[in-house]
A protein has these predicted regions:
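Glycine-rich phosphate/adenosyl-contacting loop at the front of the ribokinase-like
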Residues: 1-77, 252-253
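Short beta-strand scaffold segments in enzyme catalytic cores
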Residues: 43, 91-95, 233-236
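Short, conserved phosphate/pyrophosphate- and ester-handling motifs at nucleotide-, phospho-/glycolipid
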Residues: 45, 197, 260
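Conserved phosphate-binding/catalytic region of the ribokinase-like
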Residues: 1-7, 154-158, 206-313, 325-328, ...
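Conserved N-terminal subdomain of the carbohydrate kinase-like
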Residues: 51-136, 310
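Hydrophobic anchor at the start of a short beta-strand
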Residues: 51-52, 78, 161-163, 225
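Conserved beta-alpha-beta core of the PfkB/ribokinase-like small-molecule kinase fold
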Residues: 131, 137-215, 232-234
Length: 338
């Protein structure tokens, strides 16, 4: 195996996206894609030129073959995706919206192949990766997947590798809210970079203000925290620095799903390239804004060449081919209070 830049893990599902608006029960035609926050980030990083290994599990079925084929076409190393002959590949149905509102998503993943991930799925060779990206979704799938998440994050941190963590809360997958909060915060304590949304941070930390939420995670052991503030942008804090970075205005919001994954792609890629945290947030905001202008979870994630042209034009305040406005900073703290 060639040198691995980034290891990511989790569940990739087949996704059937409605081709017309309306209630899913009344939709007659769907377009097949793939979905999964963890693999969205992996794909985004692969498009930027990183060597990304994907650790997962799919069923021995047509949807599983479709998932693996799609990931491999995106450049992911899928040699450690296990084929499960006893459990199916999960899938989801996603509604279509034309007004920028959140789509309705129905999941069919209980008992899926990926829910049977376990510490036994970990291959020593994968632990040589420079960086591990984790989210709160795999630990919500099952006890064995939760054990794997803890072991991967612990071993990578102990080995001196950098670890990023996006809570990506999925309350419906947990037994109760208290368990979710406890386990997600335990995992966050194993990460160097923590990337919650504002509502997630409030629920998990018990604090309202972004600065206090960030301090909560810094006190637990994080080196840096970036809190997503939707269209407003993001607040970041390290042990030495803090600030707001304004969001990137977009003309039309097509699909909000995947914006947070795009943000993670920007943060991880920039930090692994030794950019400052403030510069990483600028890139993250830009990729997140690009994601919401595309129909689909990963379609808006840029290639390296696209980013070189569009992002550089955006931060320079010049008209970019996609029409993005420049990225600024200094939003008022009051804008992020309830």
């Amino acid at each position: 195996m060639s040198e691995i830049d980034i290891l990511s893990f989790g569940e990739t599902m087949a996704m059937f996206v409605a081709e017309q608006t309306g209630d899913l029960a009344e939709v007659s035609a769907f377009h097949r894609r793939i979905a999964g926050a963890d693999s969205n980030v992996a794909i985004g990083l692969s498009r930027l030129g990183f060597n990304v290994a994907w650790l997962s599990r799919v069923g021995a079925d047509s949807l599983g073959r479709f998932v693996v084929d799609t990931l491999e076409k995106e450049g992911l190393d899928c040699r450690h995706v296990d084929i499960d002959t006893a459990h199916p590949t999960g899938f989801q149905l996603k509604s279509r919206t034309d007004d920028g509102s959140d789509p309705v998503v129905e999941y069919f993943r209980r008992g899926s192949a990926a829910s049977h991930l376990s510490p036994h799925s970990i291959v020593p060779e994968l632990l040589k990766a420079r960086h591990l990206h984790a989210t709160g979704i795999p630990p919500a799938l099952s006890e064995s997947a939760r054990q794997m998440s803890f072991e991967l994050m612990t071993r990578m941190r102990e080995a001196g590798r950098s670890v990023s963590f996006d809570p990506n809360l999925r309350p419906s997958l947990w037994a109760n809210e208290r368990q979710m909060i406890t386990e997600i915060n335990r995992l966050a304590a194993l990460a160097h970079w923590v990337l919650p949304g504002l509502s997630e941070g409030r629920l998990l930390s018990g604090f309202e203000d972004p600065a206090d939420i960030a301090a909560f995670y810094l006190d637990q052991g994080a080196e840096a925290v970036a809190i997503k503030l939707g269209p407003h942008g993001a607040y970041y804090r390290t042990h030495l620095d803090q600030g707001f970075v304004a969001g990137v205005p977009v003309a039309t919001v097509v699909d909000t799903v995947g914006a947070g994954d795009g943000f993670a792609v920007g943060m991880i890629s920039a930090l692994l390239e030794n950019h400052s945290f403030a510069e990483a947030v600028k890139r993250a905001n830009w990729i997140g804004s690009r994601a919401v202008q595309s129909r689909g979870d990963m379609e808006g994630l840029p290639t390296r060449s696209e980013m070189s042209v569009e992002f550089e034009a955006a931060i320079a305040g010049k008209p970019a081919p996609t029409g993005f406005a420049s990225v600024g900073a200094g939003l008022p703290r009051a804008a992020f209070r309830r």
